[in-house]
């Protein structure tokens, strides 16, 4: 009965058309917040050749205020044991039927894109995203911008040099035009490197602390949980990445940890290019796959990753998992400081992640090690301005209300956990976060 009610509610909420006239380039509107904060003239390294091919560009659509209110109510009902909608999760197509764009609106935008010379790659099941491909020249003409390269910390990055414009006929429906830059979120793990100089300890303690799966199972009392039959059987865990991995590394780790080797199911995001390996990213994903498989040995693990196209990254892996409803849990070990993303990009992500919640997908991410100084880097001549780096800001998506940030394996004392500089408390620009004075206990003694 509850399932029938959920289906009936969705059917009764078919989205109404929002684009009332055919879009035309004769009347354009600027999209505020679409200029990347690091695309600055002082870092400019020249214009991108007009024939450069860009695949998988995306237009993400916003919801109406009525849709947003209805979605918020649905998320509350799905978590309310007394509601008939309790834990009645939606499929992506059910989500589209209630919270996506009308098909007629999608058709109008696709027609305009094709008139600009773009080829349509796909439309999301949630009917909130169109992917298309074309050249840099077509992008410049269609969105009234220029594509430039920028030198950022020794890397050559590309991005639009101005805010983007779209036809006024559908500008109010657009949350973001994405995948036009090669800024990539960074892995949150820190490889072990001996400090130099090192303290001369007067005891047998080395000062270096390392954890194996057995240690973590003791620290978080996982052995009793697994012994009770809660080993992940029947659950699916998605690891999101942006590099290919070595499955041999994963198998060797499982064997060394005393677990039966079990390879993850690997999925290369369609359209993201050929499978490619990136050193820092491979290490992060190796780590995630190794630990998730040993801590929940009964779970099915998917590894969803992007290929060699530079304008794809781990956030596209997350989008794919959500739009295809892969995984009860989506695990992300990447982040970027809030100030290092354009406002429209954050708006896009904050529109996607509630869909995961409505579909019963739990999202977890690494909290990161930078606390309230997530933007800080080692200053170089091609670093973002120092004022930007030193601003109080935290990592995203750890700061999102729809994502659970996980950390704590360094086992610090409570005064560090509740410290402003240690956690980034109240340093988010966009979302409400716990204050440093809030009593939060996350350290389990053992």
What are these regions (language model features)?
Residues 10-12:
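Boundary at the C-terminal end of the N-terminal hydrophobic targeting segment
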Residues 392-446:
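Extracellular S/T/G-rich loop segment that most often corresponds to the catalytic His/Ser-adjacent loop
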Residues 14-126, 131, 136-408, 441:
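Substrate-binding/charge-relay-adjacent region of secreted/lumenal peptidase catalytic domains
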Residues 1-8:
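Bacterial N-terminal signal peptides
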């Amino acid at each position: 009965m509850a399932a029938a009610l959920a289906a009936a509610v969705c059917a009764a909420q078919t989205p109404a058309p929002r684009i009332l006239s055919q879009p035309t380039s004769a009347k354009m509107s600027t999209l505020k917040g679409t200029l990347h904060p690091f695309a600055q003239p002082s870092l400019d390294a020249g214009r991108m050749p007009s024939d450069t091919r860009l695949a998988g560009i995306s237009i993400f659509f916003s919801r109406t205020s009525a849709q947003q209110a209805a979605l918020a109510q649905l998320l509350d009902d799905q978590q309310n044991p007394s509601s008939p909608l309790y834990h009645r999760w939606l499929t992506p197509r059910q989500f589209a039927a209630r919270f996506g764009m009308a098909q007629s609106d999608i058709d109008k935008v696709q027609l305009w894109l094709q008139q600009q010379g773009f080829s349509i790659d796909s439309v999301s099941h949630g009917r909130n995203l169109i992917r298309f491909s074309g050249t840099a020249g077509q992008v410049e003409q269609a969105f009234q911008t220029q594509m430039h390269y920028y030198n950022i910390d020794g890397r050559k990055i590309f991005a639009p040099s101005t805010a983007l414009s779209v036809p006024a006929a559908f500008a109010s429906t657009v949350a973001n035009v994405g995948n036009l830059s090669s800024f990539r979120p960074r892995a949150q793990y820190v490889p072990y490197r001996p400090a130099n100089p090192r303290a001369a300890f007067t005891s047998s303690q080395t000062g270096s602390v390392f954890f194996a799966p057995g240690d973590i199972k003791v620290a978080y009392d996982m052995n009793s949980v697994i012994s009770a039959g809660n080993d992940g059987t029947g659950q699916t865990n998605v690891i999101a990445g942006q590099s290919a991995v070595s499955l041999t590394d994963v198998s060797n780790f499982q064997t060394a940890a005393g677990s039966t080797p079990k390879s993850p199911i690997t999925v290369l995001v369609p359209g993201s290019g050929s499978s490619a390996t990136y050193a820092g990213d491979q290490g992060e994903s190796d780590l995630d796959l190794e630990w998730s498989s040993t801590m929940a040995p009964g779970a099915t693990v998917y590894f969803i990753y992007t290929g060699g196209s530079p304008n794809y990254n781990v956030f596209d892996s997350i989008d794919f998992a959500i739009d295809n409803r892969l995984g009860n849990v989506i695990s992300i070990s990447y982040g970027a400081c809030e100030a290092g993303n354009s406002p429209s990009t954050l708006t896009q992500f904050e529109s996607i992640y509630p869909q995961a919640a409505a579909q019963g997908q739990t999202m977890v991410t690494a909290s990161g090690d930078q606390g309230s100084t997530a933007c800080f880097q080692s200053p170089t001549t091609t670093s973002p301005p120092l004022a930007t780096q030193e601003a109080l800001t935290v990592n995203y998506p750890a700061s999102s209300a729809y994502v659970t940030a996980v950390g704590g394996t360094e086992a610090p004392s409570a005064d560090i956990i509740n410290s402003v500089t240690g956690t980034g408390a109240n340093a988010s620009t966009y979302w409400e976060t716990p204050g440093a004075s809030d009593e939060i206990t996350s350290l389990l003694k053992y």
